[in-house]
């Protein structure tokens, strides 16, 4: 199960994609609870400094908790996601989907920073899942698919 916490840009989109994201979690990790938390630039910068020693904001941070009620948390900064989308010539929606799937794969044990051996597999899976979910969502958007509401 996925809980979307925090409000603002991207929250409605994630709610609309929740079922598909839950399928990925179940396939990669199992029947666990994951929180996706939307945070400000200041909040993610503070977390990045505290846990990674990097004094700058980032788009996504993943924390495996492996507790009974919550397996892990994925912190996402919509503002940085939006900046990255512009930089990579991507839409905000697709970039948001990419970072959440990226976080799910980190919770599943994939690592691209310290383990080259599963980096390639991680990014291949990420691309596959993004294309599957994005393609399905684009061909069947919900009533709340107005970008201004996402």
Curated annotation (Swiss-Prot):
Cofactor: Zn(2+)
PROSITE patterns, A to Z: UPF0054
Intracellular or extracellular location(s): Cytoplasm
Main location: cytoplasm
Family matches, as PANTHER family: ENDORIBONUCLEASE YBEY, CHLOROPLASTIC
Function statement: Single strand-specific metallo-endoribonuclease involved in late-stage 70S ribosome quality control and in maturation of the 3' terminus of the 16S rRNA.
Cofactor note as given: Binds 1 zinc ion.
Gene Ontology terms: cellular component: cytoplasm
Binding residue positions for Zn(2+): 102, 106, 112
UniProt-listed Enzyme Commission number(s): 3.1.-.-
Family matches, as NCBIfam families: rRNA maturation RNase YbeY (TIGR00043)
InterPro entries in alphabetical order: MetalPrtase_cat_dom_sf_prd (IPR023091), YbeY (IPR002036), YbeY_CS (IPR020549)
Keyword Chaperone: no
Identification of the protein by name: Endoribonuclease YbeY
GO molecular function, one term: RNA endonuclease activity
UniProt keywords, alphabetically: Cytoplasm, Endonuclease, Hydrolase, Metal-binding, Nuclease, Ribosome biogenesis, rRNA processing, Zinc
Keyword Zinc appears in the UniProt entry: yes
Assigned protein family: Belongs to the endoribonuclease YbeY family.
GO biological process, one term: rRNA processing
Gene: ybeY
């Amino acid at each position: 199960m996925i809980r979307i916490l925090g409000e603002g840009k991207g929250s409605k989109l994630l709610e609309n994609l929740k079922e598909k994201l839950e399928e990925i979690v179940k396939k990669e990790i199992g029947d666990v609870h994951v929180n996706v938390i939307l945070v400000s630039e200041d909040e993610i910068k503070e977390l990045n400094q505290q846990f990674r020693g990097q004094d700058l904001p980032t788009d996504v941070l993943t924390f495996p908790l492996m507790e009974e009620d919550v397996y892990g948390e994925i912190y996402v900064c919509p503002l940085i996601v939006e900046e990255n989308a512009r930089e990579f010539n991507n839409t905000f929606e697709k970039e948001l989907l990419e970072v959440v799937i990226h976080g799910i794969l980190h919770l599943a044990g994939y690592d691209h920073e310290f383990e080259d051996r599963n980096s390639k597999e991680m990014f291949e899976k990420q691309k596959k899942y993004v294309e599957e979910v994005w393609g399905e969502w684009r061909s069947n958007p919900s009533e709340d698919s107005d970008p201004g509401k996402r």
